[in-house]
Amino acid sequence: MKPELKKLLVLNLPYLLFVYLFAKCGQAYRLAAGADASAKLLHLTNGISAAFASPLPSLHPFDLCVGVAGAVAVRLIVYSKGKNAKKYRKGEEYGSARWGTAKDIAPYIDPKFENNILLTQTERLTMTGRPKDPKTARNKNVLVIGGSGSGKTRFYVKPNLMQCFPTSDYPTSFVVTDPKGTLVLETGQMFQRAGYRVKILNTINFSKSMKYNPFVYIHSEKDVLKLVNTLIANTKGEGEKLAEDFWVKSERLFYTALIGYIWYEAPAEEMNFTTLLEMINASEAREDDPDFQSPVDLMFERLEQKDPDHFAVRQYKKFLLSAGKTRSSILISCGARLAPFDIREVRELMEDDEMELDTIGDEKTVLFLIMSDTDTTFNFILAMLQSQLINLLCDRADDKYGGRLPVHVRLILDEFANIGQIPNFDKLIATIRSREISASIILQSQSQLKAIYKDAAEIISDNCDSVLFLSGRGKNAKEISDALGKETIDSFNTSENRGSQTSHGLNYQKLGKALMSEDEIAIMDGGRCILQLRGVRPFFSEKFDITKHPHYKYLADADKKNTFEVDRFLSTLRRKRQQVVAQDESFDLYEIGLSDEDAAAE
């Protein structure tokens, strides 16, 4: 039976009783003695006794007509009353907002502690993307908002880094930004104990960093374009226009041509930014001599002879359409944009690669991205790395693992506003969930997100099913207060009228009040936070106490002996790498024969 038909029958079944009762009334009227209606009414009692003498329904046409008519009349009355019924929501007249309870969050928590994302002291979110009940499925993207000193690192970043349990059912890699360079010192040893590979990119002190070469991760012409887009997006001057002008588009063509040439034609050891810089330095255009050819022009001319349809050649020919004077200006712009690479340490950092970004989703790894929280000069390197990382992992999930990485990758992006702009991040964050990748975006204010991503900021925040508010005021507090909604409260007023006679009055009424007003949020206790999980009532809870975590004893916070020695780690790593290279080195063996004189001397 169809559900709609079944529902219709169930709703109308009670009316069969009314058909029976009204049919009996019709039978009583028919059996009552009398020639007319008034006479029958006088003897109706006898008719009722006769009608109900047998419990069986009457099948007389008159009785059936009365029964059906009576039931229809009752149905019409019920319909009319329902149509005009007043809608009351007692206790919710002005709003139904309330704080969530343990019962509300229970369906979203994994019974096994290590299988969860830690949000507050009492609220957690399971790492599984496919729970038994599909309606409780939530993405693992978290938006964390908290002003300076609110404990973003202590109450969110560290607790979640401590979830590196070897016994977890959901193995996880971490990519974490480290604005002060302290996280790697405090947690590095813990990760080594848990069997993690440790990777470090340090843009504050390049001598304490592993090497990162973006060219290693270029596998197609699309990757060339992505690298150029990221480079341009994160090396804008303070006053540069948002919309690309002619000069920026021309630079884009030039970079694409050069990087395409390097990727296709250069030997592996020369595939880096140093080669790109040398090619830019060797480029020259003369206004008074249109036939002049620089060494780079000659390189592309030879490449065109070999392959006229070469990707790099096509880009370079478009660049050459501009006049000599224009090209000179473009070359100056390119030199200015890549000025940071004139620093020897930066070039050395990016000449080789030790990151192995494409394997982070294959085995448990922690990658620390150390950046300055006061200077953004080299943050474009971090933006390039993260852009490449996300694209690499998505491609690897699709091409090798059927759409899902074997190791979940969590991007814990502290001071997200200082990282730089990741191209198409609003689109990436909406699609990474299915590849076993999640992002925790940590900000001091949501306005920081809007300043970088403009209209896309709202899309990014909407793709975070969890919002954790640690502290804030002003616009942040107002937005959170509005999102929490209103509750209905009871209020009473007393009045007193004084005159020849004194009278008193008492008036009760319902009012709507914000669950937590803007001023209440501004003065919120420093140990409390607000959690909003999509589809669940908000929670007003204690921030997570890291001293209660089983792995706290492995942090440098608990014991200074646990401090991670970066210099020692890097020197050991490079010594092992040199040994591997030495073992793999090949040598040519020559047999040298002795002359007759030398043989006689022997």
Regions found by a protein language model. Give the residues of each.
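Short, charged N-terminal helix-start/capping segments
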Residues: 4, 60-117, 293-318, 338-370, ...
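N-terminal short leaders/motifs
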Residues: 113-130, 307-325, 472-473, 481, ...
